[in-house]
């Protein structure tokens, strides 16, 4: 036997392990009492078991081979699911299979396979150590979970305790030995799961679900510390690929070639990975970038602006910064880094007029502006919100409340759904709520935040040494505090007596504390139930002590000088009786207050007096810094110092006091204040021009120390600043980080904090801890809700731009002119443009009727509200496109269609086109019908209006005789006929008239006038109205024909005999002229339209005339026919138009035989059709019928139907005997 077959285990240990290979064995009992050790079988049975054809060594050799005896059918039938078996059905061999190998040959499931080991070498067996024995026993001891879930099967013999058999085994009894022939080298995993047969390698596979019931041990065999048990259910995490929300296409015009790539400039040297990542994410998401100062936020903004400038054709890009110095700083970055052309760039502030800004919005594409200017231009309509594609917001932590940043984004969202937002800041906010408000107001979808400890920016962050100097108050400050405290003590005691304030130390007063106490007292029961006198007293106390709290803060943190200036203003107000009061006078007149003011006045008069110990440490720090930098060397050829210092303070009075003290150490120190634009009571503000001039001198070396207020905390990029001195501390982490970020941009910097021991020291620690906590929260993103729904991609989803890293060529125009791209004022100032109202897409404009407010009306807004769009004006200079020749020539098929439909007519059809019948569709003529392409003209509308008004103006009995009537008379068969032959024989010829009488003029009145017979007195001529006369006569030369017609009518009416009252025969009556008709309609609104006579020019109608082919006027009246009963029945039977046509034919034949013209006068156009031919379409000869005159109607006689029949057949043709033509400009179809 070779050495490889031996292990490190003693032979006696192997003999003990052989006892475990019994054929039938059950699990240990769950009984709490220990059972006795007892043999289950004799030695002979054990020997038989060893000799049954499968020895122990053979089984040991066969562990390395896989179970090759399984047929393929068993493998196919094996399911991936297992059936759970109860504890009583699980054999001991399966439960204890953790010590067995999977590759054993088939055997009884109740047989326990031998342990994995190697035979020990023949050496003296060492003594077993108790620790190893206990460790090995712990491996085989069943766990608590197994004891609870396993119930032993009943057996004839008592259960055997296996753990006692293995107590003497060492800890490395089952460690693997060098591989033997036929034995696997794979590792065996001990677990609580039952072994499964597999044809694969015996190397254990890791399961996804966590395993239960395991006990972890250390490398030396000891038990690992207990941990919380894992859940029985495996925690599965599914990474589903959710489809993105469909996004409507952008309305911006994109360059399809440019959007295939995005440019990353290499002008500034090697690439920074964090900048590349932020730029790539900012191109497709609304991004909030939070980077420490000096890490290239300006470069990131310029790169994104460059790509949007390339991608869009005419869209606009807006960069907003709170101050003009920050705006000008970004302008230079875009010119020198991104290479955006200067001709497309402008910088607009409130200094430019609205008219000048309107020109820039029409011509430029890139704008650098303050947020207030952008807001005003959007509200007035100067800027088009739909054209803005990118909005860059610098110092984004200001976007809270009602600041202009918030209003601009809100205004853009109303009109524009597709624009990108890039927000830049160093400190997003000091609280979770503030950061969430910034995210909501700017519609942020992603956040890229880095701290100074981030791995990818550590190599670019310069070292900053922060030094904290704790200062105690001076003796002068302590003396002033004591005197001031005594002066305020009575007021504080009075306030505490009302239980409104509980701290009786006046030096602990603060503005915030007083405001909070006042609000609390007013809301309490004592404040609500107090009378007006008490409320007035409390309000006065709170007001005085609040102002005193501000003065105490200045005294403690800024010095005696600023404190004296504040108190002096307070005293001046009281002594000048401007805002005097009981309690203010009490403070001013207090002896301790007067003593304090006198002492301060004597100190300030001394030049060497320094009002606060901070000033002493400040001067020492600044002087040492310049001496270390070599600035103290003097000489003619010495260059100016390259180091710079910035001192930050909160108040303007303190800044002026600091600059005064520092300038005493000149010329080494040249200090200047840097404040805002507003003026205070004691100092003048700095406009933007002065601010830019101060920064320019600071960079050039003319000024080496700037004493700045909060205006200098944000955004100033002055790379040579090596020392920052914080004269006062702030509890806001935003302000502290902004101050510290002014140094360490291009080289290592130093920060010195001057802190008063106590409250100011605590404020700084608070801000520092708050900053670190907020950075961790923002980085995790678990506490914030981002607006992914409002972040549009703008670029189509099918387009994936690829990066193009290249050197950007700067246009020559960007370097030739170093000035800012501010628009210059024109010689002639333009007027302020009118306000424009931009409408969102799909908005409803106009007014909606109340009947359509239910929202059920579908269609475009123009159809809902009846909006008439103005047609686009055609450009006269623009040439019409010339079509192709084949598109305008007729093809063979078109020629066949032309010949079939238009050149040939079917057999039997008339080849002549008749005149249109104006009485065919009278109802349709009174209203406008629908049109498809060509709308109705103005003359068509006038004619339709005329026809409808004429129809409304007629009485019900007159509609039948008018040319525009629709209904036939219902009593046509009852009308008698006059014997025309007899009447013509009796009536003599009428003498020639010597004087023509004119018709009376119709006068418009508001009430119906009295009807009078026609007068023969001449009246003035009525001037024709061309506007209301679309129908004109061909030869209208005069207006005398109207009088001639009236004369003829009167002569005929005088010659016709009138029937007696008893006679059944009706006389012809008088002619119904238009005067009586118009008199009936004068009271109506439409009476001013006149009648058809007004539209007919009667100048060509003579007193007596004879028309060829028609009836003529005669001096003798026609004979009237008498109708008998049979004839009346026949006429009634024929009825309507048919009977009228038959009667007309008879009258025509009789008139042609009897009528003798008395006067012949032919005009040059007698061959033309008459008005009746145009109206009725009948050019045949018609019977002359007299009409009843106006005298008959005016005399009170009843008009008979026969009168109107004659009127329709005769007088219409007499009055309109000439042809009328239609004016050429009245035709619109």
UniProtKB/Swiss-Prot annotation:
> What's this chain's function?
ATP-dependent DNA helicase involved in DNA damage repair by homologous recombination and in genome maintenance. Capable of unwinding D-loops. Plays a role in limiting crossover recombinants during mitotic DNA double-strand break (DSB) repair. Component of a FANCM-MHF complex which promotes gene conversion at blocked replication forks, probably by reversal of the stalled fork.
| GO BP, sorted A to Z | double-strand break repair via synthesis-dependent strand annealing; interstrand cross-link repair
Q: Which GO terms describe its molecular function?
A: 3'-5' DNA helicase activity; ATP binding; ATP hydrolysis activity; four-way junction DNA binding; four-way junction helicase activity
Q: Which GO terms describe its cellular component?
A: nucleus
What protein name applies here? ATP-dependent DNA helicase MPH1
Q: Which UniProt keywords apply?
A: ATP-binding, DNA damage, DNA repair, DNA-binding, Helicase, Hydrolase, Nucleotide-binding, Nucleus
Q: Which Pfam families match?
A: Helicase_C (PF00271), ResIII (PF04851)
Which parts of this chain are annotated as the region Disordered? 20-85, 811-855, 952-1229
Known partners and oligomeric status: Interacts with the MHF histone-fold complex to form the FANCM-MHF complex.
**Where does the record place Basic and acidic residues bias?**
68-78, 955-965, 1068-1077, 1173-1185
Question: In what ranges is there compositional bias, type Acidic residues?
Answer: 1078-1088
Question: Where found in the cell?
Answer: Nucleus
Q: What is its EC number?
A: 3.6.4.12
The broad enzyme category this protein falls into is hydrolase
Record field: compositional bias (Low complexity): 1003-1012
- Report the source organism: Botryotinia fuckeliana (strain B05.10) (Noble rot fungus)
Q: Where is the Helicase C-terminal domain?
A: 614-790
Q: Where is the composition biased (Basic residues)?
A: 825-837, 1018-1030
């Amino acid at each position: 036997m070779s050495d490889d077959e031996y292990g490190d285990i003693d032979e006696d240990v192997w003999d003990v392990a052989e006892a475990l290979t019994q054929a039938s064995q059950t699990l240990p009992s769950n009984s709490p009492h220990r059972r006795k050790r007892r043999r289950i079988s004799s030695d002979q049975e054990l020997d038989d078991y060893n000799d049954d054809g499968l020895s122990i060594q053979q089984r040991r050799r066969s562990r390395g081979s896989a179970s090759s005896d399984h047929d393929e059918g068993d493998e196919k039938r094996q399911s991936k699911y297992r059936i759970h078996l109860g504890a009583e059905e699980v054999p001991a061999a399966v439960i204890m299979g953790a010590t067995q190998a999977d590759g054993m040959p088939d055997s009884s499931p109740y047989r326990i396979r031998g342990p994995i080991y190697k035979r020990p070498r023949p050496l003296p067996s060492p003594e077993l150590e108790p620790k190893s024995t206990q460790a090995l026993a712990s491996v085989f001891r069943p766990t608590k979970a197994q004891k609870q879930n396993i119930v032993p099967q009943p057996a004839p013999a008592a259960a055997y305790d296996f753990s006692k058999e293995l107590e003497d085994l060492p800890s490395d009894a089952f460690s693997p030995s060098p591989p033997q022939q036929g034995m696997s080298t794979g590792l065996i995993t001990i677990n609580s799961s039952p072994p499964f047969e597999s044809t694969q390698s015996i190397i254990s596979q890791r399961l996804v679900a966590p395993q239960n019931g395991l006990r972890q041990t250390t490398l030396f065999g000891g038990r690992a510390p207990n941990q919380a048990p894992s859940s029985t259910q495996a925690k599965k995490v599914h990474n589903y690929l959710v489809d993105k929300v469909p996004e409507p296409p952008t309305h911006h015009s994109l360059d399809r070639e440019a959007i295939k790539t995005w440019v990353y400039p290499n002008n500034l040297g090697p690439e920074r990975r964090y900048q590349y990542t932020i730029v790539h994410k900012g191109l497709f998401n609304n991004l909030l970038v939070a980077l420490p100062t000096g890490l290239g936020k300006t470069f990131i903004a310029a790169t994104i602006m460059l790509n949007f400038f390339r991608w869009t054709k005419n869209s606009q890009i807006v960069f907003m910064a709170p101050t003009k110095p920050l705006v000008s700083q970004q302008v230079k970055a875009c010119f020198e880094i991104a290479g955006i052309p200067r001709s497309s760039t402008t910088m607009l502030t409130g200094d430019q007029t609205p008219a000048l800004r309107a020109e820039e919005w029409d011509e430029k594409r890139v704008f650098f502006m303050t947020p207030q200017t952008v807001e005003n231009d959007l509200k007035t309509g100067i800027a088009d919100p739909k054209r803005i594609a990118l909005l860059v917001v610098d110092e984004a932590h200001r976007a809270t409340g009602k600041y202009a940043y918030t209003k601009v984004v809100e205004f853009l969202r109303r009109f524009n759904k597709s624009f990108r937002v890039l927000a830049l800041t160093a400190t997003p906010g000091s609280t979770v709520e503030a950061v969430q408000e910034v995210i909501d107001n700017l519609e942020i979808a992603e956040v890229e935040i880095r701290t100074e400890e981030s791995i990818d920016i550590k190599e670019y962050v310069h070292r900053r040494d922060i030094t904290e100097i704790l200062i105690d108050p001076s003796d002068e400050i302590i003396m002033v505090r004591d005197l001031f405290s005594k002066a305020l003590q009575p007021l504080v005691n009075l306030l505490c007596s009302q239980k409104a304030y509980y701290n009786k130390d006046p030096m602990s007063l603060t503005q915030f504390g007083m405001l909070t106490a006042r609000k609390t007292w007013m809301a309490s029961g004592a404040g609500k139930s107090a009378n007006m006198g008490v409320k007035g007293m409390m309000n006065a106390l709170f007001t005085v002590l609040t102002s005193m709290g501000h003065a105490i803060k200045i005294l403690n943190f800024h010095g005696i000088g600023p404190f004296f200036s504040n108190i002096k203003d307070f005293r001046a107000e009281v002594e000048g009786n401007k805002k005097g009061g009981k309690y203010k006078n009490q403070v001013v007149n207090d002896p301790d207050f007067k003593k304090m003011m006198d002492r301060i006045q004597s100190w300030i008069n001394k030049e060497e007096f320094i009002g606060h110990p901070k000033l002493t440490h400040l001067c020492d720090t600044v002087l040492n810094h310049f001496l270390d930098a070599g600035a103290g060397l003097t000489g003619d050829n010495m260059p100016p110092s390259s180091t710079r210092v910035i001192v930050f303070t909160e108040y303007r009075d303190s800044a002026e006091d600091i600059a005064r003290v520092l300038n005493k150490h000149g010329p080494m120190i040249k200090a200047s204040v840097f404040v805002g634009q507003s003026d205070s009571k004691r100092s003048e503000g700095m406009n933007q021009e002065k601010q830019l001039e101060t920064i320019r001198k600071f960079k050039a070396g003319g000024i080496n120390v700037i004493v700045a207020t909060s205006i200098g905390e944000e955004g100033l990029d002055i790379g040579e600043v090596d020392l920052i001195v914080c004269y006062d501390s702030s509890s806001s982490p935003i302000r502290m980080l902004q101050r510290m970020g002014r140094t360490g941009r291009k080289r290592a910097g130093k920060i010195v904090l001057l802190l008063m021991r106590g409250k100011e020291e605590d404020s700084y620690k608070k801000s520092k801890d708050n900053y670190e906590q907020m950075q961790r929260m923002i980085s995790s993103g678990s506490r914030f809700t981002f607006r992914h729904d409002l972040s549009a991609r703008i670029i189509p989803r099918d387009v994936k731009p690829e990066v193009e890293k290249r050197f950007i060529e700067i246009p020559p125009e960007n370097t030739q002119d170093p000035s800012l791209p501010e628009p210059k004022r024109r010689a002639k100032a333009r007027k302020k443009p009118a306000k424009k109202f931009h409408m969102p897409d799909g908005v409803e404009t106009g007014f909606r009727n109340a009947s359509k407010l239910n929202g059920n009306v579908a269609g475009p807004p123009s159809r809902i509200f009846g909006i008439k769009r103005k047609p686009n004006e055609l450009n006269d200079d623009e040439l019409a496109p010339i079509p192709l020749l084949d598109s305008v020539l007729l093809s063979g098929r078109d020629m066949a269609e032309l010949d079939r439909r238009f050149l040939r007519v079917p057999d039997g059809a008339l080849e002549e086109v008749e005149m249109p019948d104006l009485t065919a569709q009278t109802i349709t003529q009174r209203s406008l019908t629908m049109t498809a392409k060509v709308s109705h003209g103005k003359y068509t509308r006038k004619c339709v209006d005329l026809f409808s008004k004429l129809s409304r103006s007629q009485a019900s009995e007159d509609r039948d005789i008018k040319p525009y009537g629709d209904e036939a008379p219902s009593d046509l068969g009852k009308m008698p006929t006059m014997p025309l032959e007899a009447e013509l024989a009796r009536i003599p010829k009428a003498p020639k008239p010597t004087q023509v009488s004119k018709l009376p003029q119709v006068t418009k009145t508001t009430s119906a006038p009295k009807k009078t017979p026609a007068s023969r007195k001449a009246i003035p001529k009525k001037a024709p109205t061309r506007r209301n006369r679309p129908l004109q006569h061909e030869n209208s030369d005069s207006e005398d024909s109207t009088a001639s017609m009236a004369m003829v009518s009167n002569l005929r009416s005088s010659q016709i005999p009138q029937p007696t009252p008893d006679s059944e025969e009706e006389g012809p009556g008088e002619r119904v002229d238009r005067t009586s008709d118009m008199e009936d309609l004068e009271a109506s609104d439409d009476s001013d339209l006149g009648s058809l006579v007004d539209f007919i020019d009667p100048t060509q109608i003579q007193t007596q005339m004879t028309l060829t082919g028609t009836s003529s006027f005669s001096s003798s009246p026609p004979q009237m026919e008498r109708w008998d009963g049979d004839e009346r029945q026949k006429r009634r039977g024929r009825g309507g138009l048919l009977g009228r046509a038959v009667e007309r034919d008879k009258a025509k034949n009789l008139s042609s035989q009897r009528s003798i013209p008395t006067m012949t006068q032919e005009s040059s156009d007698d061959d033309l059709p008459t008005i009746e031919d145009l109206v009725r379409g009948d050019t045949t000869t018609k019977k002359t019928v007299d009409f009843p005159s106006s005298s008959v109607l005016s005399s009170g006689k009843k008009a008979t139907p026969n009168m109107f029949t004659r009127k329709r057949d005769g007088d219409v043709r007499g009055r309109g005997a000439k042809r009328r033509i239609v004016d050429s400009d009245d035709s619109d179809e």
